[in-house]
């Protein structure tokens, strides 16, 4: 938020959570605690980070959520504040990006299905795929093409995952869902295999080429440079 207010960053992605309270916990009877808000965080323009829940009920707070468990977002309300170069920004709901890019609507069942499948794959428990067994994780901070090629996501591996998924009723994935998200499945399998072999950071690196938010951020470098130039000229005036 501070970087956005001072025009030092061009934000790409999703609206942040909207938690900007400073709270203290006071013990009460029965071992419980009473949380009191004693301060709020504000950005340099005067925006409150905290999402406003005053107009919804306790029931809506817990149940008015989307498929990913997040509160359904509403557009910014109230008076607009401005960045150093005059761009309008709004408070009361986290930090809204300059370019909003939401991840694709992949069913969570596919995410957990891939996770479960790769755990068994890396443990050497899937017949016909012994070459994917990972006896020990070798932590790496930078992947090479050789690392990626050591555990390729082949058509045979994807077919084995399909069969695995359809024998697990808890995932409840249809043929239509599987085929519609085939690119995501391949990318997520690559990510989980690299995580099992080389660590979490390596897994994230493997996923970056398929991350639509990352790709859009890279495409926005020219816009970020333009904004930085405008901010520098404004500072000199």
What are these regions (language model features)?
Residues 24, 36-57:
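Extended catalytic-interface subdomain
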Residues 1-34, 40:
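Cleft-lining beta-strand/loop regions that shape enzyme active-site pockets
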Residues 48-49, 53-237:
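Conserved functional hotspot residues or short segments at active or partner-binding sites
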